[in-house]
Amino acid sequence: MAKAIYFDMDGTVADLYGVPNWLHKLRTCDPTPYIEAKPLCDMKKLAEVCNILINGGYTIGIITWLSKDSTPDYDNAVTMAKIEWAQHHMPFINEFHAIPYGVPKHTVVKRYAEMWLVDDNADVRAEWETPKQRKTINANNDIVAELWKLVGR
């Protein structure tokens, strides 16, 4: 059975909102907050559980929105910054999707029999969920502990 887990970035695994002057920088088309953001969880522990999930058949990816107010050039810069962050902090991921702000996240990925989204936004989680196929993990909780539940620990 094909399975996948997707992570949101901003506010879920990357502390964008903790970067000084993040909003001003984004509004002036400065992508550096996406690189400067610190991880929101212990990335070694996240890598440990994700690698076990990968060995168990899961695809691990990121689905992240681009800036709300943007231009094509800024979208490219943000995408590159987010990829750089992901490669540094989450080198185990198999997929990366940077999509326009507000696009439903389930519309951009391949269908799997079991699909999880780890996200801090309740509305995004509600839009993702279905009774059988698509489930969510609230990133406001301990995401590493929640992922261990999928492993069976």
Q: Where do the PLM segments sit?
A:
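Acidic carboxylate-rich catalytic motifs and surrounding loops in phosphoryl-/glycosyl-chemistry enzymes
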Residues: 64-68, 94-105, 141
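Acidic, Mg2+-coordinating phosphoryl-transfer loop and its flanking beta/alpha structural elements
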Residues: 116-153
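Conserved Lys-Pro-Asp/Glu-containing loop-to-beta segment of HAD-superfamily phosphomonoesterases
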Residues: 97-128
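A general structural motif
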Residues: 1-2, 57, 93, 112-114
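Alpha-helical substrate-recognition element adjacent to the catalytic core
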Residues: 4-85
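Structural recognition of alpha->loop->beta junctions
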Residues: 82-98
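Alpha-helical structural signal in soluble globular domains
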Residues: 52, 85-89, 127, 131
